[in-house]
Every structure is written in C-alpha cells, then in structure tokens.
UniProtKB/Swiss-Prot annotation:
One of its GO terms (cellular component) is cell outer membrane. This is Opacity protein opA50. The gene is opaC. Implicated in a number of adherence functions. OPA proteins are implicated in pathogenesis and are subject to phase variation. Keywords: Cell outer membrane, Membrane, Signal, Transmembrane, Transmembrane beta strand. InterPro entries: OMP/PagP_b-brl, Porin_opacity. It is found in: Cell outer membrane. The keyword Membrane applies. Gene3D superfamilies: 2.40.160.20. Belongs to the opacity porin family. Disulfide bonds: none annotated.
Length: 236
C-alpha cells in the first residue's frame, strides 16, 4: 500500500465484451396497433447479440470509496431477412392451368448503442495489500438509434400449358402491413457493478469487472447489457 492510503485521481482503460438484449414492441401481424398491422417478424422483435468495445474512465479514489465517470461506444448491429412462400389457389381440371399466390417478405433492421456516459459510486473491500474486490452502482445517459423496414409483396402467378397463353404474373395485390420506423432516443438508465482489482504497483491496478445496465424505456424499445471487462487503472 502507498503512503497516502490509495487516495487520489485516476484514469482507467478497459476492453469490454458485451451481451446485448434488445426487445422491440413493434405492432404484430395479428394485433392491429393504431390502425396499422406490421409485417415485422419475431427475429427483429427480440434481438440477442454481442460486441467488443473500449471504455475509458476518470475518477477519484478516496481510499475505500471511488467515484468515476466513464464513456463507451458500442458496435452497430444490422441484419436483413428475406422469405418467400407460394400458395396454390386454384387448378383448372380441364386444362391443368394453375394459379398460385407468391408472398415475399423483406426485412432490414439495425440497432446502435451510439454512446453511454455514466457516473459510478464504487466501494473497494480491502482483502490484503494486493486484492480488492468491489461493488458499485451506476447511472448513465445513453443514446441509441434503431430502424426497421419491413415490406410484403403478394404476386399472383399463372402456370399454363394451354397453347396461346403464356405463364407469368396475372396480378399484383396491394402490399399489406408495410412497417417503416427509425428512432434516435436518449434516456437515463441504472446498473450495478462488481469486480476485483489487483495492485501491480502502488499506482497501477489490473481490473477485472462485470456490469449490468438497464438503459431504461426507450420509446417502444427495451435494451439491457451484460458486460465483462479487463482493464488497467492508474492512480496519480
């Protein structure tokens, strides 16, 4: 331990692995919402992904309690999904002409936790001169962007062997339930922190930590992250 009891300002740099759970309350195909019916699939309503990102912090160590401000920026998630189904509508017995309906669904979605600016209060447990487990609480101002573009196209197809009649499209039905949405939202959320610090030198500490954060109610979106991180903390 140092002569000043470990007190003083510090900086910390971490590399974090984040598990991200994103839930969107988009209108459902079977549940009209405000007169609109959505074609958004469950895949884009309930997203589970992960990312690796850096995090930087500045704080002050009071010799037991610490306060810290941190900043992180996450990786953007995006994906698309295409599906097609063909339904037989009618077969003419006398000439075997067949009418089918072809339904195509195209979805493009993205989600980006643009930034998180947090303030934490942390308590270090003094186990010995080297190891210091800790727990803490965090409040953060987060900024997220998300978008969805979901469309459905229904096409009538005619298959025929009748001379003089060509197979092909016989009608295109009105596209039902297209859903397009793009939001940029800022909210305050709450989280918890836990981990352990190992003093390499009196001023340099290796830090292994975990944090859970609920980003709050983001309009029609809920966002939660679990993060495991490894970093170093230098006290001046």
């Amino acid at each position: 331990a140092s002569e000043d009891g470990g007190r003083g300002p510090y900086v910390q740099a971490d590399l974090a692995y984040a598990y991200e759970h994103i839930t969107h309350d988009y209108p459902k195909p079977t549940d009209p919402s405000k007169g609109k019916i959505s074609t958004v699939s469950d895949y884009f309503r309930n997203i589970r992904t992960h990312s690796i990102h850096p995090r930087v912090s500045v704080g002050y160590d009071f010799g037991g309690w610490r306060i810290a401000a941190d900043y992180a920026r996450y990786r953007k998630w995006s994906d698309n999904k295409y599906s097609v189904s063909i339904k037989n509508m009618r077969v003419h017995k006398h000439n075997s002409n067949r009418k089918n309906l072809k339904t195509e669904n195209q979805e493009n979605g993205s989600f980006h936790a643009v930034s998180s600016l947090g303030l934490s209060a942390i308590y270090d447990f003094q186990i010995n001169d080297k190891f210091k487990p800790y727990i803490g609480a965090r409040v953060a101002y987060g900024h997220v962007r998300h978008s969805i573009d979901s469309t459905k196209k229904i096409t009538g197809l005619l298959t025929t062997s009748t001379p003089g009649i060509m197979s092909g499209v016989y009608k295109v039905l009105r596209t039902p339930g297209a859903h397009r949405e793009s939001d940029s939202i800022r909210r305050v959320g709450l989280g918890v922190i836990a981990g352990v610090g190992f003093d390499i030198t009196p001023k340099l500490t290796l830090d292994a930590g975990y944090r859970y954060h609920n980003w709050g109610r983001l309009e029609n979106t809920r966002f939660k992250t679990h993060e495991a991180s490894l970093g170093v903390r230098y006290r001046f």
